[in-house]
């Protein structure tokens, strides 16, 4: 019997340069390539699936000849939780040097926590956060995670 994946599995972004995007998400979001292929079609020259290997979810990056998708913009974003404020601040310093800091870090209290926005190589926004409760609350509603 084949395994069937059910539920929320991935988010896909169209990119101009797959290697550049892999480098960005590896350095800023701690993701690694778990699958790659080169269909060499105009709508999918190269494909990579990235994961943090913490949860069963992937960021799918697809390199195309012409990017026509609308970037997520300044607020629409991919959110990644970090293990400390210091980890975020170290990446903020890198982002400042690379000119990709989209919004200064902010402490918004519960349930948002400490967060910052960066621009990825294709204009999408990556949010790094510490202390956000998004994933935990999603499971708590289903009694899978005990209240702290």
Where are these regions (language model features)?
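Vicinal oxygen chelate
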Residues: 1-4, 8-16, 48-53, 68-148
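Short beta-strand/turn micro-motifs at beta-sheet edges
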Residues: 1, 62-68
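Conserved segment of winged-helix/HTH DNA-binding domains
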Residues: 55-63
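Core segments of cupin and vicinal oxygen chelate
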Residues: 12-56
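A short beta-turn/loop motif at secondary-structure boundaries
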Residues: 39-42, 68, 107-111
């Amino acid at each position: 019997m084949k395994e069937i994946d059910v539920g929320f599995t991935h988010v896909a972004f169209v990119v101009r340069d797959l290697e550049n995007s892999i480098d960005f998400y590896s350095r800023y979001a701690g993701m690694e390539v778990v699958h790659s292929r080169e269909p060499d079609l105009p709508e999918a020259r190269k494909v990579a699936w990235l994961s943090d290997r913490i949860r069963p979810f992937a960021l799918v990056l697809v390199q195309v000849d012409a990017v026509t998708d609308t970037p997520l913009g300044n607020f629409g974003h991919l959110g990644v939780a970090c293990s400390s404020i210091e980890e975020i601040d170290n990446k903020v310093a890198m982002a400042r040097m690379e000119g990709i800091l989209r919004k200064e870090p902010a402490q918004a209290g519960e349930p948002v926590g400490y967060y910052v926005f960066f621009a990825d190589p294709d204009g999408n926004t990556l949010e790094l956060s510490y202390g956000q409760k998004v994933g935990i609350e999603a499971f708590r509603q289903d009694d899978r995670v005990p209240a702290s």
